Curated annotation (Swiss-Prot):
The gene is IDH1. This is Isocitrate dehydrogenase [NADP] cytoplasmic. It comes from the Eukaryota. Signal peptide: none annotated. Transmembrane segments: none annotated. One of its GO terms (biological process) is isocitrate metabolic process. Binds 1 Mg(2+) or Mn(2+) ion per subunit. It comes from Sus scrofa. Its cofactor is Mg(2+); Mn(2+). One of its GO terms (cellular component) is cytosol. It is an enzyme of class 1 (oxidoreductase). The keyword Cytoplasm applies. Disulfide bonds: none annotated.
Amino acid sequence: DLAGEIHGLSNVK
């Protein structure tokens, strides 16, 4: 879901 994508982007950072 969106939360998962947000976490993924934050994880990249």
